[in-house]
């Protein structure tokens, strides 16, 4: 019907840090469709974490032609902060959504450059260029860093029960729906980890066009970033890097932590170029993000290590938490509250 548009989330589950695009796009060629993105960071650290989301949306448009859509929606919320968004860099996601909705051919890099020029400093100004270049890179790397320290290699739904802030891959709530539990998705056991959506499992790969179906269905050709979305892979599975799956998982979590620490250093370069209030605000939030990244890394690797029985590679930073202590972390918040630094420091 011409007066009906079916609104579809960008991915098959629910705005995870990385999902393949929903196969509903293209499956109903006679039905008007629109995509639903999430601007607010329900699963990407709320307004405590820097996560520039335009690369995620650009990734979606690599698979789904904008011309096939009738409209775009963005799920967002605002608060009482002066900047409405909490994190100063969360404003960039509102801006990027508007720019991509108007012109989806724009690159996420171009949009980040526009936003930086209007918000902090001009990339083309020789005085600001070196600093702006570093902050532009920080923005462009931020979403991938979140993927790495939260749910790399296609993992998803590992977050805490209820409010979705922080890791809880062990979560098991008696009487709750099985598909609300992390174990329903990660399916970690002594043999391996990941959700088998190939032809030997749920066969979700068959919902994609033939070329992608073949790519995703074969564990030998499935891209690393979607491996554990589509396959229950053995811990010793050889990744594209040549590492085992377990080693690659460790390296990805560790890389995410190191990335956030590099963001702290890059941001410190801006102190003499912007106002003190915004400088300190972002600096404080990056401290939270750095500690949260370690929290995620330790929680997930210590938990999954109970199944793999394998040691972390020598180069990977060792945990600073005990698994049993992490299992006791409970934040007294709901979906619409962002934990404060004081709360996090007392509880995680």
Regions found by a protein language model. Give the residues of each.
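Generic structural motif
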Residues: 11, 40-42, 120
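Flexible loop/turn segments at secondary-structure boundaries
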Residues: 13-16, 42-47, 82, 145, ...
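Eukaryotic scaffolding regions of large macromolecular assemblies
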Residues: 17-19, 47-50, 54, 86, ...
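Catalytic domains of carbohydrate-active enzymes that cleave complex glycans
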Residues: 62, 67-348
